[in-house]
């Protein structure tokens, strides 16, 4: 089975209630936890939609902005991310190096770029620090021609995500007179399961979507040993979780869904945090079981502006208050858009023909089942650092 996880987050910069958390997380995990909190905000307005984000990508783009911020703008970013401007560089540089390491065996690429208006002068320390931390190059584009600028940026995105994401930026988001910078982060992931699914075990089964409607969708199936467990939310709602490691074993997929089919996925999501996911990793036990998982493709573009404002990052969006003096001292800048687009594809390796509906998981004496036939939560975790590369909910495969 192949998993392709290209991801892109874009911040366009133009002219002119923070939650509490136990201090039990490593610095590497703090950025991902911020992304999970953003995810929780998004889900509030999209409880029945497919949502895919990258917490690590959110941490990266906020880290890039933090390096250019000053005053209260920097303070808000530091408070929500929970490490200072010096810490952000050290931590994210360490995480990125670990994530793209060839030791992982799975393919992970992380790319960053700053696109600036022709003739726009970026402060040398900002450009140098971004290059050191994020391997980020500054590229000039002609924002006076929005269509041309979009083509250049979209081409970069398509190339860095191996063709999986294109047409992200549209000309109407570019102000030909005012747009000065576009910051971009792209993450691409491709992994093979440690325990692979066989195409002959795939058949259509019923999946009950978030809207209550039933759909017949192709379901992957296998009998193997998986680490799994169950726990309950503070208000007593039980849910189950399972780990599917990739063949390099440094990256895993975790799936969680309510134990009772009558419990909506939205009821357990507010309970999810980096600390929660860490507890799953520490309490799961290996069991031989039958796993049934839907094949699916999900594409989602999300505006992160309101979720970030809900967490307390507000000033960088306000023309009269934003302070990005470390990017440039010649003009006043503020963030006009912060967008994220992610695509996830789940497919069997090399399978192009019609699915063979061979049923082999019927025997009454078979091991316990873990059936994912209703809305579920998934995350892709880099285990050595605890970084969450991708996080999403699937309401309809």
Curated annotation (Swiss-Prot):
Tell me which residues are glycosylated: 159
Q: So which residues are the signal peptide here?
A: 1-19
> Which terms does the UniProt entry file under GO BP?
blood coagulation; cell differentiation; cerebellar granular layer morphogenesis; dense core granule biogenesis; detection of mechanical stimulus involved in sensory perception; embryo implantation; innervation; long-term synaptic potentiation
- Does Iron-sulfur count among this protein's keywords? no
Molecular function GO terms recorded: glycosaminoglycan binding; heparin binding; serine-type endopeptidase inhibitor activity; signaling receptor binding
Tell me which CDD domains the record gives: serpinE2_GDN
> What keywords are annotated for this sequence in UniProt?
Developmental protein, Differentiation, Glycoprotein, Heparin-binding, Neurogenesis, Protease inhibitor, Secreted, Serine protease inhibitor, Signal
Query: SMART domains, per this entry?
Result: SERPIN
Q: Where is this site: Reactive bond?
A: 364-365
> What is the annotated role of this protein in its UniProt record?
Serine protease inhibitor with activity toward thrombin, trypsin, and urokinase. Promotes neurite extension by inhibiting thrombin. Binds heparin.
* Family (UniProt): Belongs to the serpin family.
Please report the name of this protein according to its UniProt entry.
Answer: Glia-derived nexin
Give the gene that encodes this protein. Answer: Serpine2
């Amino acid at each position: 089975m192949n998993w392709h996880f290209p991801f892109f987050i874009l911040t366009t910069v133009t002219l002119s209630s923070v939650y509490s958390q136990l201090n039990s997380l490593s610095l590497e995990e703090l950025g991902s936890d911020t992304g999970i909190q953003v995810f929780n905000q998004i889900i509030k307005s999209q409880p029945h939609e497919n949502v895919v984000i990258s917490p690590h990508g959110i941490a990266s783009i906020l880290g890039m902005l933090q390096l250019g911020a000053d005053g209260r703008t920097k303070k808000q970013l530091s408070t929500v991310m929970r490490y200072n401007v010096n810490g952000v560089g050290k931590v994210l540089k360490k995480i990125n190096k670990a994530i793209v390491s060839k030791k992982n065996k799975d393919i992970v690429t992380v790319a960053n770029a700053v696109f600036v208006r022709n003739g726009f002068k970026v402060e040398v320390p900002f450009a140098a620090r971004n290059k050191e931390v994020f391997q980020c190059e500054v590229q000039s584009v002609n924002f006076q021609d929005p269509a041309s600028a979009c083509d250049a940026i979209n081409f970069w995105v398509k190339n860095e995500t191996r063709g999986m994401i294109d047409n992200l930026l549209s000309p109407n988001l570019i102000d030909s007179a005012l747009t000065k910078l576009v910051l971009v982060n792209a993450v691409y992931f491709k992994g093979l399961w440690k325990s692979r699914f066989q195409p002959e075990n795939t058949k259509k089964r019923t999946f009950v979507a978030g809207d209550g409607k039933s759909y017949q969708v192709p379901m992957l199936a296998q009998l193997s040993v998986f680490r799994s467990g169950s726990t309950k939310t503070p208000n007593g709602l039980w849910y189950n979780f399972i780990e599917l490691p990739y063949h390099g074993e440094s990256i895993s997929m975790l799936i969680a869904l309510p134990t009772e089919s009558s419990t909506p996925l939205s009821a357990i999501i507010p309970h999810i945090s980096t600390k929660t996911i860490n507890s799953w990793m520490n309490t799961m036990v290996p069991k031989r079981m039958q796993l049934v998982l839907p094949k699916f493709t999900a594409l989602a573009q999300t505006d992160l502006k309101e979720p970030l404002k809900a967490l307390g990052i507000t000033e960088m969006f306000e023309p009269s208050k934003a302070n990005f003096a470390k990017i440039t001292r010649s003009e006043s800048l503020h963030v006009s858009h912060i967008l994220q687009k992610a695509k996830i594809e789940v497919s069997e390796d090399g399978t192009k023909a019609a699915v063979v509906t061979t049923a082999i998981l019927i025997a009454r004496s078979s091991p316990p089942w873990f059936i994912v036939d209703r809305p579920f939560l998934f995350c892709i975790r880099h285990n050595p650092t605890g970084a969450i590369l991708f996080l999403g909910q699937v309401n309809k495969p």
